[in-house]
């Protein structure tokens, strides 16, 4: 497989996680996952920015993206069952990684929306890859490409969301 082809399939593989991670900006709101509870340090466990609607909406959107991908490239997945499971795990893993990042940011007393370089851009990716590993994985070279490429996509998407008025800060 050539380098460009390898990069394309790496992006195709991770696409459900990208969509899942971006969707809560548009679908979120409502009841916070932590229910307003505080950790023993006195800070919120996750904060108002992590809601059930955003989490479940993100997992749903990411899973749907995987189903659509299956119909476009069935050979990539082998079966619809594998596509649904992989897309669900990538999406769920991405948002679990985002929740862990939010938890860590609250422990560091970082306010909601405050940037944490590396944690914001890669936490969701690493968690998505880990959750999906038992079903289907990609090469180490493809993983390295995603580790380099994802922060660029993340920063660009956040800036776009800011310019569209969907986010209050450009990071």
From Swiss-Prot:
InterPro entries: CarS (IPR032690), CarS_archaea (IPR002726). Signal peptide: none annotated. The chain crosses the membrane at residues 7-27, 55-75, 84-104, 115-135, 141-161. Pathway: Membrane lipid metabolism; glycerophospholipid metabolism. It is a multi-pass membrane protein. It is found in: Cell membrane. GO terms for biological process: glycerophospholipid biosynthetic process. Keywords: Cell membrane, Lipid biosynthesis, Lipid metabolism, Magnesium, Membrane, Phospholipid biosynthesis, Phospholipid metabolism, Transferase, Transmembrane, Transmembrane helix. PANTHER family: CDP-ARCHAEOL SYNTHASE. This is CDP-archaeol synthase. It comes from Thermococcus gammatolerans (strain DSM 15229 / JCM 11827 / EJ3).
